[in-house]
C-alpha cells in the first residue's frame, strides 16, 4: 500500500511479528518467549527505523556514531536486574502496550548503518563501534571486525551485526 509511510509499514510488520510469536508461545506453553527486533527501511530520500528491545541501530557519518534506536530496558537505577527488557516481540498486547520505537530521517551518501544485537554492545562501547566501522574498508570488513573484536572479549551472548553503506547511484 503506497499510501502508508515507511514507519507505518515497520509498525505493521512489528505488530504482526509480535502476534505470531506470542500465539506460538501460547500454543506451545512457552512462558516469556520473545525476541528483539531492529530494522531499517530505505526510501527515496529518507530511512525509517524501528526497534523493540535492546538490539540497536547506529548511524556512522563522517566518523561520528549516533545511536538511532531506543533501548527498551529498565532505568539505570534498576540495572542490577541485568538483561531485563521492557519491550520485546512476543509479549502480546494484553501484557502491556506493545510499542516499537519508530523514527525517520534523511540520509547522506557514505552513511553507514549498523544493526546489531546486544552481544556486540555489551562488549564494545559506542565509540569503539563507530571507529571500527568507520576505518573498515568495506561493510563486510566492518561486520567481520566488529564481531571479531566482541568475540575476543569472550562474549557469552550471541553476536549479530549487519553493516550497510549508502552510495550515490550513477547512471
How does the language model describe each region?
Residues 1-171:
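PP2C/PPM-type serine/threonine phosphatase catalytic domain
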Amino acid at each position: 500500500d503506497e499510501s502508508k509511510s515507511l514507519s507505518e509499514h515497520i509498525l505493521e510488520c512489528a505488530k504482526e511479528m509480535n502476534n505470531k510469536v506470542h500465539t506460538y508461545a501460547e500454543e506451545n506453553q512457552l512462558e516469556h518467549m520473545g525476541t528483539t527486533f531492529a530494522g531499517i527501511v530505505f526510501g527515496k530520500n529518507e530511512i525509517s527505523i524501528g526497534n523493540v528491545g535492546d538490539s540497536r541501530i547506529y548511524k556512522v557519518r563522517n566518523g561520528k556514531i549516533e545511536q538511532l534506536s531506543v533501548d527498551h530496558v529498565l532505568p539505570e537505577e534498576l540495572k542490577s536486574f541485568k538483561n531485563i527488557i521492557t519491550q520485546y516481540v512476543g509479549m502480546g498486547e494484553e501484557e502491556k502496550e506493545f510499542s516499537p520505537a519508530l523514527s525517520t530521517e534523511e540520509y547522506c551518501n557514505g552513511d553507514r548503518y549498523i544493526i546489531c544485537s546486544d552481544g556486540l554492545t555489551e562488549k564494545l562501547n559506542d565509540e569503539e563501534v563507530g571507529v571500527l566501522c568507520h576505518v573498515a574498508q568495506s561493510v563486510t570488513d566492518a561486520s567481520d571486525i566488529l564481531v571479531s573484536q566482541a568475540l575476543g572479549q569472550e562474549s557469552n551472548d550471541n553476536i549479530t551485526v549487519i553493516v550497510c553503506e549508502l552510495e550515490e547511484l550513477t547512471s
